[in-house]
Swiss-Prot record:
SUPFAM superfamilies attached to this UniProt entry: Periplasmic binding protein-like I
UniProt cross-references to PANTHER family, sorted A to Z: AMINO ACID BINDING PROTEIN (PTHR47151:SF2), LEU/ILE/VAL-BINDING ABC TRANSPORTER SUBUNIT (PTHR47151)
Protein name: Leu/Ile/Val-binding protein homolog 1
Biological source species: Brucella melitensis biotype 1 (strain ATCC 23456 / CCUG 17765 / NCTC 10094 / 16M)
GO biological process: amino acid transport
Length: 371
């Protein structure tokens, strides 16, 4: 029999679609269910579902149970707007999502116009919370923070290196690459190459030839794991021995599946891993017993629901405007990420980014290990 953590939440989702009055508060989960970033969508969905089940088991929020509805944005901005409009039409009050910054930013504007509060576990582009909207929150950090850490690390550890900054032309990828480049330039280091590639590209031979010709020995990648894995593998196949460094867009075990053994030694920034917090040991075990590894954004999504529920309780209301006000004024909230507070923009007060290295474990599998 297949184990599951989420039977109660699955029932709530069915009821929500069926139009029953069982649940009074409808939460939308806007994620890439399909497409190249579906692995991150699964993380966000599993985390939110588990946290919602915990909230419902404790009586819901202000006496009202939570139901969920899921929208597949396919990591596409236009589809994200369609999902946002559908959520608004369905009476969604709160959204957990989206993942991609390029989807989250335009969707947030639809939500603001329709009185919906949004908490993103993965949108790191600063613009998301710099729009001056009342409804934008995130449980992750920002690329101006992450890029600063990456740029300083490269400067400190790869002096006199020839550095290529490569990005995927998206608000997330190019935004992160530009923040890293900005920090390097502030420190007096000029990149050797600055290149953009297209999302979905498969053959990076021309890029790698250019990197080799320029004598590049450090490649910083602003983008996600599908392209990163191919670049890493093709660099190895074509004899380019350069250190590959990236950000939180490659924190999926799928990276190792795509890159193969060449992934070993890859570096990336991300927040401190909440799986390593002893306070989360029981929860992490529940996920693993159900056959799901709660990596990357799983617990960031869980914390989003925890913040929402506690803010609603503090506000004494499930009205999104009142909850948004409480999120900014009534913290900190007890979450799997620790005590979490939000500033006036909706950005969280979190520990800084740290560096991870991809290494082969005793089980023969590659994983990212905090340095």
């Amino acid at each position: 029999m297949r184990k599951t953590l989420f039977s109660g939440v699955a029932l709530a989702a069915v009821i929500a679609f069926g139009g029953s009055a069982w649940a009074d508060v409808l939460v939308g989960i806007g994620i890439p269910v399909t497409g190249p970033n579906a692995v991150y969508g699964a993380q966000i969905q599993k985390g939110a579902e588990a946290a919602i089940k915990e909230v419902n088991d404790a009586g819901g929020i202000n006496g009202e149970k939570i139901a969920i509805t899921i929208g597949d944005d396919v990591s596409d901005p236009k589809q994200g707007i369609s999902v946002a409009n559908k959520f608004a039409a369905d009476g969604v009050k709160f959204v957990i999502g989206h993942f991609n910054s390029g989807v989250t930013i335009p969707a947030s504007q639809v939500y603001a116009e329709n009185g919906i509060l949004e908490i993103s576990p993965g949108a790191t582009n600063p613009q998301y919370t710099e729009q001056g909207l009342w409804n934008t929150f995130r449980t992750c950090g920002r690329d101006d923070q992450q890029g600063t850490v990456a740029g300083q690390y490269i400067f400190d550890h790869f002096k006199d290196a020839k550095i290529a900054v490569v990005h995927d032309k998206t608000p997330y990828g190019q935004g992160l690459a530009d923040e890293t480049k900005k920090k390097l330039n502030e420190l007096g280091t000029k990149e050797t190459l600055y290149e953009g590639v297209n999302v979905g590209e498969k053959d990076f031979s021309a890029l790698i030839a250019k990197l080799k010709q320029a004598g590049v020995n450090v490649v910083y990648w602003g983008g996600l794991h599908p392209e990163a894995g191919l670049i890493i593998r093709q660099m190895a196949d074509q004899g380019l021995k350069a250190q590959f460094i990236s950000g939180d867009g490659i924190v999926s075990n799928e990276l190792a599946s795509i890159a193969g053994p060449a992934v070993e030694g890859t570096l990336n920034t991300f927040g401190p891993d909440p799986r390593n917090n002893p306070d989360n040991a029981e929860l992490v075990k529940k996920f693993r017993d159900a056959g799901f590894e709660p990596e990357a954004y799983t617990l960031y999504s869980y914390a989003a629901v925890q913040s929402l529920a506690q803010a609603a309780k503090a506000a004494g209301s499930n009205d999104p405007q009142e909850v948004a006000k409480a999120m900014k004024e009534k913290g900190p909230f007890k979450t799997v990420l620790g005590d979490l507070s939000y500033d006036e923009k909706g950005d969280p007060k979190l520990p800084g980014y740290v560096m991870y290295k991809w290494e082969k474990g005793a089980d023969g599998k590659y994983n990212y290990i905090q340095q």
